[in-house]
Amino acid sequence: MKVRSSVKKMCDNCKVIRRHGRVLVICSNVKHKQRQG
């Protein structure tokens, strides 16, 4: 899980979602997991 000020899709499988007021990126590639911090 990377914590970044700007989260971006890193590939076509990445999805940007909002959970509990946080912006997250979920993906089949574990290295692409991000959240805004």
Swiss-Prot record:
One of its GO terms (biological process) is translation. Keywords: Ribonucleoprotein, Ribosomal protein. InterPro entries: Ribosomal_bL36, Ribosomal_bL36_sp. The keyword Chaperone does not apply. One of its GO terms (molecular function) is structural constituent of ribosome. Disulfide bonds: none annotated. It holds the Pfam family Ribosomal_L36. It comes from the Bacteria. GO terms for cellular component: cytoplasm; ribonucleoprotein complex; ribosome. Belongs to the bacterial ribosomal protein bL36 family. PANTHER family: 50S RIBOSOMAL PROTEIN L36, CHLOROPLASTIC, LARGE RIBOSOMAL SUBUNIT PROTEIN BL36C. This is Large ribosomal subunit protein bL36.
